[in-house]
Amino acid sequence: MQARAVRRHIRSSPLKMRRVINLVRDRSVPEAVAILDYMPQKVTGVVEKTIRSAVYNLMDQHDERFDEGALKLKEIRADEGPTFQRHQARARGRAAPIRKRTTHLKVVVAVEEEAPEEAAA
């Protein structure tokens, strides 16, 4: 069982977002949230909210409560969104471009399957 949450048009560059999500990729949900709590980056709050949203989506879709320790981040991805372009006045009547980048964040949470124990022969 799995569920996803998507957050779009986040006002942060994808590179800054990827620096954070690379540290929590392929971890359990409580471990990822604990790591995010102690990181100083501004985007950690957005990443944590999106992870929690995916967990709640899983509980809502399957009408049952899951132990958060059994949930794992199956996929977490930061894609580039639209770029807002502005101009800043420069010397001699010129203009320099300002690119305000945005990010689309996708989180997929799945129930970690336990390996079946082999029967002793």
Swiss-Prot record:
Any one GO CC term of the record: cytosolic large ribosomal subunit
CDD domains for the chain: Ribosomal_L22 (cd00336)
UniProt GO molecular function: rRNA binding; structural constituent of ribosome
Keyword check for RNA-binding: yes
Domain of life from the UniProt record: Bacteria
GO biological process: translation
Family: Belongs to the universal ribosomal protein uL22 family.
General function of this protein: This protein binds specifically to 23S rRNA; its binding is stimulated by other ribosomal proteins, e.g. L4, L17, and L20. It is important during the early stages of 50S assembly. It makes multiple contacts with different domains of the 23S rRNA in the assembled 50S subunit and ribosome. The globular domain of the protein is located near the polypeptide exit tunnel on the outside of the subunit, while an extended beta-hairpin is found that lines the wall of the exit tunnel in the center of the 70S ribosome.
Protein name, entry field: Large ribosomal subunit protein uL22
Native species: Salinibacter ruber (strain DSM 13855 / M31)
